[in-house]
Amino acid sequence: MKTNGLKRHLSMALAVCIVSGSLLAGCGSKTEKAAASTTASAAVSSQAQASESAEPSDEPATIKYMVFSTEANDAYTKMDLAGSFKKVKPNITVEIEKVKDSGEFENALKIRKAANELPDIMPMKAYMLADFKDALAPLNDIEAAKINMYADEFAIDGNILGVPECMFNEFVWYKKSIFKEYNLQVPKTWDEFISVCNTIKAGGKYIPILMGGKDAWPDYPFNEYMPALEANDGAIWNTMAGIDEPFSKDKPFYIAYSKIQKLYDAKPFGSDPLGAGFDQVKTMFGSKGAMIAAGAWFLGDAKKAVADTSDIGTFFLPVKNTTGDKLNTITTVDGFFATPKDGKNIEASKEFINFLFSKDFYSQYMKERGLVSVVKDLKVELDPILQQAYDAEPDVNFVVYDGGNTEFQRIQAATKFDVKKMGQEMMAGKSLDKMMESLNKSWKAARASK
């Protein structure tokens, strides 16, 4: 992945695009010069072609689309994705298969790859592209890839194997009424954040932070992203892959995890943080929950849970030590639509991917999900609920998250390094120092075993 180029593009798309109180996404193209010279009419023309550029075929086809995001699935149902595409391509039927979460999705893909039965459409995470590269069809020729700001930045050996759907930031979602009840202000530092949790907890009426720790993944804003934020290094996993003992006390990972441990020691997740999954606790945001840490993808769930949406506020996770420090926040490019190279419906799949990025459908979907556009010159206004975080921190530094290169993945597999599971263990009371000591030993051994 071309990290430097990606960071330059994201800076243009996020930092520059906070205009007149709204974050306008997709306002930068490949370079500033190109952005200046590309007219809106050209963009509309390009996007209008998005569902038409794949090799046309009138042969009947049924394509299977595996979806793991509940929020995406809800949006597809509301927008009638299958029916909308059927109007454009009457000969192609789309069948959506919903799986529980990203973990189940990845496991299912591994099993089906071995059986040569991958689904036609797969919304992969960035790191999965390398894992499945030998099974994926190049998408360089489709219009969706050509109008995408970041598709080529994630190309492998010159091949675009997945077209990214969106980019998004991470937030702490909170109930304004609860903050008002306890006379609380939005925290600006990590210690202030923990203090807010303690105040709410002491009141005895609400759970300070909803977690759903029975599922491992919901702790990702803390256990996965905070080391990158502490280091101001979105490629921290790659950096760590070049170090024998990256878990020592003077390293960013340990420093970040010490902060996380301080939060977990405050026990802000209720009496049994590992006793319920995310789907169980997310509905409590409308009643017993004061805060929840999640990405922009949580917007639909937040609106479902809270009757009065004006009561929903957002702020960036305040990982900094003092108010004078610059705040770092994670930016993720996500949802890489891919199709198997040995699939029976490659052309139909390409037409469907193009449709997903067609102007009318894509614009509506981005608004519905509260996500940021990655289509060149297509501006989608951010939802006002999310805009609150940007207004409160206009100088926030966007840290572009990289899921890790092949060397990191090799070491990760050898050491069974799993940050989300570590989060569960920390909540359960496992010693941080012992975890770090053990990881240093296994990490060093894994690096030496090349």
Regions found by a protein language model. Name each.
Residues 87-88, 93, 182, 266, ...:
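Extracytoplasmic/periplasmic substrate-recognition and gating elements
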